[in-house]
Curated annotation (Swiss-Prot):
Family per record: Belongs to the glucose-1-phosphate thymidylyltransferase family.
UniProt keyword list: Antibiotic biosynthesis, Magnesium, Metal-binding, Nucleotidyltransferase, Streptomycin biosynthesis, Transferase
UniProt organism field: Streptomyces griseus
GO molecular function, one term: glucose-1-phosphate thymidylyltransferase activity
Pfam family, one: NTP_transferase
Record's cofactor remark: Binds 1 Mg(2+) ion per subunit.
Pathway: Antibiotic biosynthesis; streptomycin biosynthesis
EC number of this enzyme: 2.7.7.24
Record lineage: Bacteria, Bacillati, Actinomycetota, Actinomycetes, Kitasatosporales
Cofactor: Mg(2+)
Protein name: Glucose-1-phosphate thymidylyltransferase
Source organism superkingdom: Bacteria
GO biological process entries: streptomycin biosynthetic process
Amino acid sequence: MKALVLAGGTGTRLRPITHTSAKQLVPVANKPVLFYGLEAIRAAGIIDVGIVVGDTADEIVAAVGDGSRFGLKVSYIPQSKPLGLAHCVLISRDFLGEDDFIMYLGDNFVVGVVEDSVREFRAARPDAHLMLTRVPEPRSFGVAELSDSGQVLGLEEKPAHPKSDLALVGVYLFSPAIHEAVAAITPSWRGELEITDAVQWLIDAGRDVRSTVISGYWKDTGNVTDMLEVNRLVLETTEPRCDGLVDERSDLIGRVLVEEGAEVRNSRVMGPTVIGAGTRVTNSYVGPFTSLAEDCVVEDSEVEFSIVLRGASISGVRRIEASLIGRHVQVTSAPEVPHANRLVLGDHSRAQISS
């Protein structure tokens, strides 16, 4: 069995961060979202992985390499522009061959899904197996309609009047039958080859399409709110450890991870929080639910429930919360600040905030 990981797309909902970085590499608890998926695929016993890449191919390749760090063998499949999930399957035909495969959206975050779904698929080997989850607003997702026995009757892509609240999670399992389906469908009104249309083709052809309503956690990390929520969830599992320097005037409270080379001076850090390697925190309050990446500087400031990327600097800011701050951003004080500041700043930005 192989894996097809989709790491193209433009990440418009995470702009300006994704103007200069692949959305799949935005870190959660200081580790790129994509890496969690690759680790889950390896844990399921799959080694051969094809990664579909687009405009950010160089960045993805630099981060993942040949996959050996994950125990994987990685191949890269270029997609000239986003033309739909089914198009990703179409252009990956040579890599996939006649093998069964799992298709995994690289910007999704799932817990307790991949291993179980692969095991279930291998045991029953239907033509397609879909992972579903109940959502409060199904009109924003691909939605499945099921029979009383759980058989998939039909799929709709972002329907105006959904027939269920069961949304498609970004994990699909297919037999080689899917290749006939993606070759048979035509582009949707969006000009894309939709995977929902390909699966519907299998259903209409009388093929065996099954589903599982997952009990594990799932988030599409395509927007800031969901990124912060996933960061919170992962930080909840953080084991406290201090490999850096914390002076006697500082307090680490709860699950705080201070990585090697980090310094905390005259500050209070409330867990769960991660302080990245080489980061300096001085005269500040950080956390809870905060990730500071490597080589950041936080001084005379408060940062809570936020993700701060590599090399960012925050100085003299009374309070930042619920924020995603890009690489090498500089945030400094300026007159007349509100009590809290909510920011989404792209890489290499400069912002002035009053103290």
